[in-house]
Design a protein with these regions (language model features):
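Radical SAM/AdoMet-radical enzyme domain recognition
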Residues: 51-66, 75-192, 339-416, 423-425
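Short glycine-enriched, charge-decorated loop/helix-capping segments at active-site entrances
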Residues: 36-44, 133-139, 204-209
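Short acidic/His/Gly/Ser-rich catalytic and metal-binding motifs that mark active-site loops
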Residues: 30-33, 130, 196-201
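Short Fe-S-cluster ligation motifs
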Residues: 56-74, 308-328, 534-551
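Soluble or luminal CAZymes and related metallo-dependent hydrolases
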Residues: 45-49, 139-143, 168, 172, ...
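N-terminal [4Fe-4S]-dependent radical SAM core
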Residues: 1-21, 255-274, 290, 310-336, ...
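Accessory C-terminal segments flanking Radical SAM cores
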Residues: 196-311, 417-547, 551
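Canonical Radical SAM [4Fe-4S] cluster-binding loop centered on the CxxxCxxC motif
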Residues: 11-49, 290-293, 297
Length: 551
C-alpha cells in the first residue's frame, strides 16, 4: 500500500481546480481509440475564445491550466496560450499531447521559454509497430520518443506518460513502463479505454479486452506503484480489478470532470428527456459511467413517479419536486434550523440530522411520547457525535436513534452505553476524502464482535461487517440535487451520487449469500481500507457474527 504522504499528495492533486481547455478540433494522428473523434471537424478554436477561457478560468479559481485538443501543439497560437497562462499566474501550465511536435527542439524551446511546465505524452505501444498502428501514423512512435527525450534532456518540464490500455497493448504494459523508466520518466497514468468515438464505432471488437483474462497483466503494471521513485495513476479502471492496489482507484471527485465533458447531453436529458447519444447496452456495459447513468435514470423515473419515500434538504426550499412524499429529512446545525427546513418539506414524518439537539422536546400525542418538529412526528434522529448520542438518549420518546459509527462514537458507546439501548440503530458515514475515512472509520467486525448490539438494526452495513443482514438505506431524494430553477441539476446530481451511491464490491462477493441485496461499501471506504474486509458469507446464519478479514 502507498504511504500516507503519497496518498495525500495524490488526493490533493485530484482535487486541484483545473481549467481544461480544448484548443483544436483536429489532430495530426488518427488514434483508433480516440474518444473525441466525433467532435473533430478539422478546425482550430479561435484564439480569442481560448484566451477568454484562460482568463475566466483563473478568475473562477483554477490553479492548473491544461491545454488539450484534439492535438494542442498544432494550433498556430499555441505558444501564446502558454505565455498567457503564465501571466495569469496559474500554478501549473500543462499540456496533453501526442508529442510529435516536441521532436523539433526549437519548437520545444519556444514552449518552455513561454512557461510550459508539464508535458503529458500519450504513448500507446512498446514499439513503432504497435504504437503506430494504434495512432494511425507511420513514424509517430519515433517522433514521440524523440520529443520525450528532448524534454527530459532539457530538464525544465515535468514529463509524464498516458497509456490508453486496450487489447493491443495490455500485455506489454510493464515492457512499456520499463522502457520509459530507463530514459528517465517517473510518472505514468494508465487509462482504461472507454466506448466513445472511434473506440466504439471502429474498435469494439479489436480494442476492448476481457478483464478476467488480462487481470495479471494489469496487476503487474499496478505493482510499479510500490516503487518509491515512481508515481502511477489509474483512470476509468473498474475498481474490483484493482484489489491489492485500491489506493490507486480513481478519486471519485474526478467523475465531475467526466460529467462536465458531456454536460450538454446531460442537460438535454434533464430538460427535455432527450436520450444520451451514447445510450447502447453494448457501450454502457463497457463504460466507466454506467453506474452513474443508471442511477440517474432511476432518479429521473423516481421523480416522475413520486416513488421516493423521503425528501431531504439542508436548507428551506421554495418548492418541493412533489408534495406527496411520506417523510421529510432535515439536515441542519440545530433543531431551530431543522424546523425551518422541515416546514418547507411535505410529509407527516421527519428524520432529523443535526449537530446539536438542544431544544428538541418530547410531547404526549395520543398517549404516546413523541417529538414534534414543524408539526411533523420525528421517527428518526441521526447521531454523529458522542454529545448527540447522549442528548437523544436523555430525551426519551419513541423515535429511532441512528448512530453513525466512528472512532469517537464507538469508543463512547463501549464506555457509556453497553449493551446498546433499545432505540439504537447503526449506520456508517461516507466521506469525500480518504483522509477523512482514516480519521473516522473503525474496524466494524471488531466493534460488533465486542459490543453488545445483537438486537440492533444495522443500516447500510454489509452482513460480513455487521454480523447480520442489514436494513437497506431509505429511498431518498436529496434537494441538493436541484438547481436554482428547482429542477434536477447534473452537477448537483453527480455530487450526491458520489457521496451517496458510488458503492462497490469485491469480485469474491459474488459467492456471498447476501450478494443480491447487499449494496457493498462506499468507494472511499475501499480506497482507504481495501477490499480485504469484504469476505463472502457462505452460510445463511445471520447470527454467526461478523466475518473477519483475511490477514
Amino acid at each position: 500500500m502507498l504511504d500516507a504522504n503519497r496518498i495525500q499528495q495524490h488526493e490533493s492533486a485530484a482535487h486541484e481546480k483545473r481549467n481544461w481547455i480544448r484548443l483544436t478540433a483536429q489532430c495530426n494522428n488518427r488514434c483508433t481509440f480516440c474518444l473525441d473523434s466525433d467532435a473533430h471537424n478539422g478546425t482550430n478554436i479561435s484564439p480569442m475564445t481560448i484566451k477568454a477561457q484562460i482568463i475566466d478560468g483563473k478568475k473562477q479559481g483554477a490553479t492548473r491550466l491544461i491545454l488539450s485538443g484534439g492535438e494542442p501543439t498544432i494550433h498556430p497560437n499555441y505558444v501564446e496560450f502558454i505565455a498567457l497562462g503564465r501571466r495569469m499566474n496559474y500554478r501549473r501550465v500543462q499540456t496533453v499531447t501526442n508529442g510529435r511536435m516536441f521532436s523539433y527542439k526549437p519548437f520545444l524551446d519556444k514552449c518552455l521559454d513561454a512557461g510550459l511546465q508539464e508535458i503529458t505524452f500519450s504513448v500507446h505501444g512498446p514499439n513503432a509497430k504497435i504504437h503506430d498502428a494504434l495512432v494511425g501514423v507511420r513514424g509517430a512512435f519515433d517522433q514521440e520518443v524523440q520529443g520525450i527525450i528532448n524534454s527530459l534532456e532539457d530538464g525544465r518540464p515535468i514529463v509524464n506518460i498516458d497509456i490508453v490500455i486496450n487489447r493491443m497493448n495490455v500485455k506489454y504494459l510493464t515492457q512499456m513502463m520499463d522502457m520509459f523508466i530507463e530514459i528517465g520518466v517517473k510518472e505514468f497514468d494508465l487509462l482504461q479505454i472507454i466506448p466513445f468515438g472511434r473506440a466504439f464505432h471502429e474498435g469494439l471488437a479489436s480494442l476492448f479486452y476481457d478483464f478476467e483474462e488480462h487481470a495479471d497483466y494489469i496487476q503487474a503494471a499496478l505493482a510499479y506503484s510500490k516503487r518509491p521513485d515512481l508515481h502511477v495513476w489509474v483512470n476509468r479502471m473498474p475498481p474490483p480489478y484493482m484489489e491489492g492496489f485500491e489506493t490507486l482507484i480513481q478519486d471519485p471527485y474526478k467523475l465531475n470532470d467526466e460529467v462536465r465533458g458531456r454536460k450538454e447531453e446531460y442537460d438535454e436529458l434533464l430538460a427535455h428527456g432527450t436520450a444520451l447519444s451514447c445510450k447502447d447496452p453494448e457501450r454502457c456495459r463497457r463504460c466507466y459511467l454506467d453506474l452513474l447513468c443508471g442511477q440517474l435514470d432511476r432518479t429521473i423515473e423516481g421523480l416522475q413517479e413520486h416513488s421516493f419515500e423521503t425528501l431531504r434538504a439542508d436548507k428551506p426550499i421554495k418548492k418541493a419536486p412533489y408534495d406527496d412524499s411520506k417523510r421529510a429529512w432535515a439536515v441542519a446545525k440545530n433543531v431551530i434550523e431543522a424546523a425551518q427546513i422541515a416546514a418547507t418539506l411535505p410529509g407527516a414524518e421527519l428524520i432529523l440530522e443535526c449537530d446539536d439537539y438542544s431544544g428538541l422536546a418530547i410531547d404526549l400525542v395520543d398517549g404516546v411520547e413523541t417529538a414534534l418538529v414543524a408539526g411533523k412526528r420525528v421517527v428518526r434522529a441521526d447521531a454523529k457525535t458522542p454529545a448527540a448520542i447522549d442528548q437523544l438518549l436523555a430525551l426519551g420518546g419513541n423515535f429511532e436513534i441512528a448512530v453513525h459509527l466512528t472512532q469517537a462514537t464507538a469508543a463512547h458507546l463501549h464506555e457509556h452505553h453497553n449493551p446498546a439501548p433499545a432505540r439504537l440503530a447503526f449506520t456508517i458515514s461516507n466521506y469525500e476524502l480518504v483522509t477523512d475515512n482514516w480519521a473516522n472509520d473503525i474496524y466494524l467486525p471488531a466493534f460488533f464482535g465486542t459490543y453488545d448490539a445483537a438486537g440492533a438494526v444495522r443500516e447500510g452495513i454489509p452482513a460480513c461487517q455487521g454480523g447480520k443482514t442489514p436494513r437497506r438505506r431509505p429511498s431518498v431524494f436529496d434537494a441538493r440535487m436541484l438547481g436554482e430553477d428547482g429542477k434536477l441539476d447534473i452537477f448537483g446530481y453527480a455530487h450526491r451520487y458520489i457521496e451517496e451511491s458510488y458503492y462497490t464490491k469485491s469480485r469474491r462477493c459474488r459467492d456471498c449469500v447476501h450478494d443480491l441485496e447487499c449494496e457493498g461499501v462506499h468507494i472511499n471506504f475501499v480506497r482507504s481500507h481495501g477490499y480485504a474486509p469484504l469476505m463472502p458469507v457462505l452460510a445463511a446464519d445471520e447470527d454467526a457474527g461478523p466475518v473477519a478479514a483475511v490477514a
